Amino acid sequence: MKPPIIIINFKAYENSFGDKAVNLGKKIEKISKEYSVEIILSTPATMIYRMSQEVDLPIYAEHVDPVPLGAFTGAILPEMVKDAGAKGTLINHSERRLRADEIDDVLKRTKKLGLKSILCVDRYELVYPFSLLKPDAILIEPPELIGTGVSVSKAKPEVITRAVDEIRKSEGIYLIAGAGITTGEDVYKALKLGAHGIGVASAVMKAKEPEKVVEDFITSALRAISS
């Protein structure tokens, strides 16, 4: 994981699984290699193995459950996604919230397994406290902006700048900005405000030409870090 970080969360859209997901992943892989910018794909658990076999990009889980090995029907464990080929996982996404003690447990297990961790928080006040648990990155997403097309970098730039101030108190942890990021200009502003990368979902997954959206994000990110 290195800046500029771009993570695309596939969620559970029509094109999030099966051949459609693989084809999208291959298109993103091609653009990623063209610009030498690594893109992380966070996919449904049922797609981790196939995506990791057919797409040459880091595949992350969208969520893992904070339960041990044992009698937990339907649970998706860190050990399972690791075995399926995942390189990391999202933790505590706004659509899959965990308690603080559960986050601590999951982070300990992902570290032990060698999985990268992207911990999601919904406000900047949580950045420093959760940075003490040493995730690889913290993704800040005001939930009211998720999926709206109104980006955090435009609507609430102070959320990013304050989160940047908080992340600087801990060494070696990246800050990723998410929620409503739709255009290349949103990406550019987020990185210029101090974020190390961006997290997106619907802007790519619901786009008519997702590869063009991804290319716009990459070129905007590169422009931000080089200017």
From Swiss-Prot:
Annotated pathway: Carbohydrate biosynthesis; gluconeogenesis; Carbohydrate degradation; glycolysis; D-glyceraldehyde 3-phosphate from glycerone phosphate: step 1/1
Top-level taxon of origin: Archaea
The protein's assembly and partners: Homotetramer; dimer of dimers.
The name this protein goes by in its record: Triosephosphate isomerase
Record-stated family: Belongs to the triosephosphate isomerase family.
GO molecular function: triose-phosphate isomerase activity
Purpose: Involved in the gluconeogenesis. Catalyzes stereospecifically the conversion of dihydroxyacetone phosphate (DHAP) to D-glyceraldehyde-3-phosphate (G3P).
Residues the record lists as binding substrate: 9-11, 146, 180, 201-202
Catalyzed reactions: D-glyceraldehyde 3-phosphate = dihydroxyacetone phosphate
UniProt GO BP: gluconeogenesis; glyceraldehyde-3-phosphate biosynthetic process; glycerol catabolic process; glycolytic process
Intrachain S-S bonds: none
Active site (record annotation): 93 (electrophile), 141 (proton acceptor)
Pfam families membership: TIM
Enzyme Commission code(s) on record: 5.3.1.1
Organism: Saccharolobus solfataricus (strain ATCC 35092 / DSM 1617 / JCM 11322 / P2)
Keywords from the UniProt entry: Cytoplasm, Gluconeogenesis, Glycolysis, Isomerase
GO CC annotation: cytosol
Subcellular localization(s) per the UniProt record: Cytoplasm
HAMAP family: TIM_A
InterPro entries: Aldolase_TIM (IPR013785), TIM_sf (IPR035990), Triosephosphate_isomerase (IPR000652), Triosephosphate_isomerase_arc (IPR022891)
Top enzyme class: isomerase
